[in-house]
């Protein structure tokens, strides 16, 4: 079974091959299931294949507390290479970084981004940060 080519593209950083991506939104409810809060979200977890060239871009982003970046996770069709889906993020801060190498499992880096804005197609979610 073929896999979908997915890449992480961030302003000023080398493009990376995505192994896993997850993001979610939630809305608080009361004990009866009725909405009691506004939708919340804006964090994206992304696992990428390590470049294995000593490139510390993602780590540098993590340890720079005021460094916001824009970018996208791009999903392309396997056969044609045409754009299938794009998740864009604006004013994203890297708030978690893990690098792991495991024998027979490979070498990867995993980051968590806290984003002011996430866009998936025609849907945009904006965190109203002060």
Question: Model segments located where?
Answer:
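Glycine-rich, low-complexity intrinsically disordered segments
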Residues: 1-130
């Amino acid at each position: 079974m073929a896999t979908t080519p997915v890449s992480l593209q961030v302003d000023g950083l080398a493009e990376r091959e995505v192994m896993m991506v997850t993001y979610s939104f939630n809305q608080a409810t009361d004990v009866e299931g009725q909405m009691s809060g506004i939708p919340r979200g804006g964090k994206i977890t992304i696992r990428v294949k390590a470049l294995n060239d000593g490139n510390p871009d993602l780590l540098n982003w993590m340890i720079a507390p005021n460094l916001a970046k824009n970018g996208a996770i791009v999903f392309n069709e396997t056969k044609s290479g045409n754009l299938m889906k794009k998740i864009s993020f604006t004013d994203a801060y890297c708030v978690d970084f893990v690098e792991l190498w495991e024998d027979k499992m490979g070498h990867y880096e995993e980051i968590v981004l806290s984003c002011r804005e996430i866009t998936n197609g025609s849907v945009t979610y904006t965190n109203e940060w002060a």
